[in-house]
From Swiss-Prot:
UniProtKB keywords: Calvin cycle, Carbon dioxide fixation, Chloroplast, Photorespiration, Photosynthesis, Plastid, Transit peptide
Note: The basic functional RuBisCO is composed of a large chain homodimer in a 'head-to-tail' conformation. In form I RuBisCO this homodimer is arranged in a barrel-like tetramer with the small subunits forming a tetrameric 'cap' on each end of the 'barrel'.
Protein name: Ribulose bisphosphate carboxylase small subunit, chloroplastic 2
MF-aspect GO terms: ribulose-bisphosphate carboxylase activity
SMART domains per record: RuBisCO_small
Organism: Petunia hybrida
Length: 180
């Protein structure tokens, strides 16, 4: 109760002290009319927005006829050398490699309900067991070749599992069936 009672002189003093240390308010930009104009008016709309000439090489992902799967799915299929580099990366991080496959849908879909559930394409079948203790990328690539032979019309992905934090750290499509 005592702290809420102040004299009006104390309020005025503290307000003036706060105003003395304040910065002047922003008054806006200067008028462009005061600067001399030495260039002609360009009505070409392509010159308005530019990122240094790189606009011509950018492409837009086609929304029809191409499914988006997971990480790196927008790229062309990875070669064996590129797969080995990705696998070596996850092994160097100390993650456990594991293969998973899906025979019907290699992408998220809604069949039984509109909200995410078990049967929406997120959960794939594990190929054998996680490769605990694996230190050679060619072993993982060999398992991938076996999975391709067993299920040639399936999507196969490689995941890297961190068994300390118990999370999946990397996942990418290693094989797509013909026609996808």
């Amino acid at each position: 109760m005592a702290s809420s009672v102040m004299s009006s002189a104390a309020v005025a003093t503290s307000t003036n002290a706060a105003q003395a240390s304040m910065v002047a308010p922003f008054t806006g930009l200067k008028s462009a009319a005061s600067f001399p104009v030495s260039r002609k008016q360009n009505l070409d709309i392509t010159s308005i927005a530019s990122n240094g000439g790189r606009v011509q090489c950018m492409q837009v992902w086609p929304p029809y006829g191409k499914k988006k799967y997971e990480t790196l799915s927008y790229l062309p299929d990875l070669t064996d050398e590129q797969l080995l580099k990705e696998i070596e990366y996850l092994l160097n991080k100390g993650w456990v490699p594991c293969l998973e496959f899906e025979t019907e849908h290699g992408f998220v879909y809604r069949e039984y309900h509109a909200s995410p559930r078990y049967y929406d394409g997120r959960y794939w079948t594990m190929w054998k067991l996680p490769m605990f203790g694996c230190t050679d990328a060619t072993q993982v690539l060999g398992e991938l070749q076996e999975a391709k032979k067993a299920y040639p019309n399936a999507w196969i992905r490689i995941i890297g599992f961190d068994n300390v934090r118990q999370v999946q750290c990397i996942s990418f499509i290693a094989y797509k069936p013909p026609g996808y």
